[in-house]
Every structure is written in structure tokens, then in C-alpha cells.
Amino acid sequence: ELKYQLLKKYSGYLSSLRQEFSKKKKKGKLPKEARQKLLHWWELHYKWPYPSETEKIALAEATGLDQKQINNWFINQRKRHWKPS
């Protein structure tokens, strides 16, 4: 009985919440192929892993990612895996 009353009272609110959550962009890993291309560049430039703007554009085109994703990947990669010599 209580469950029924609560559902009746809040069903509109619950369905609007459900809709809002389904709109949220799902976060996840970048596609494997894109990660492999970025890692390949990383390995070739490990001593100074800072791509130029031109290189970032080329990487974005090669991977199908946008430049913000490229920038974020390099920021995270340097933070997690780079030890400047």
C-alpha cells in the first residue's frame, strides 16, 4: 500500500530523473585503436612528450578524437607515466 502511494505521488518526478540520467554522456576509455596511435607517438617522443599544435591536429585526425581529448590524454599520460630525465 505504502509503495503504491509513493509510486503514485512521485512517478512523474522519477520518470523525469530517469530521462535526465539517460541523457548524461557515458564516460569510458578511448577507443583501443586511438590509444594505440597515441601510445606510439608517446614512445617515439618519450624524452619530451609535448606535441606541437600541428602534431595535435594530426593526431586528432588520425585517431578520430577531438583536440580536447588529445590534450587531456597527454596531460594524464605525463602525470601518470612520465619521469623527466
UniProtKB/Swiss-Prot annotation:
InterPro entries: ELK_dom (IPR005539), HD (IPR001356), Homeobox_CS (IPR017970), Homeodomain-like_sf (IPR009057), KN_HD (IPR008422), TALE_homeobox (IPR050224)
DNA-binding region coordinates: 22-85
Compartment list: Nucleus
Keyword list, A-Z: DNA-binding, Homeobox, Nucleus
Subcellular location, principal: nucleus
Boundaries of every ELK domain copy: 1-21
Stated name of the protein: Homeobox protein knotted-1-like 4
GO molecular-function terms, A-Z: DNA binding; DNA-binding transcription factor activity, RNA polymerase II-specific
Record's GO cellular component terms: nucleus
Tissues in which the UniProt entry reports expression: Strongly expressed in ear inflorescence primordia and shoot meristem. Weakly expressed in embryos. Absent from leaves.
Ranges annotated as spanning the membrane: none
Keyword Iron-sulfur included in the entry's annotation: no
Similarity comment: family membership: Belongs to the TALE/KNOX homeobox family.
SMART domains with a match to the protein in the record: ELK (SM01188), HOX (SM00389)
Record's function text: Probably binds to the DNA sequence 5'-TGAC-3'.
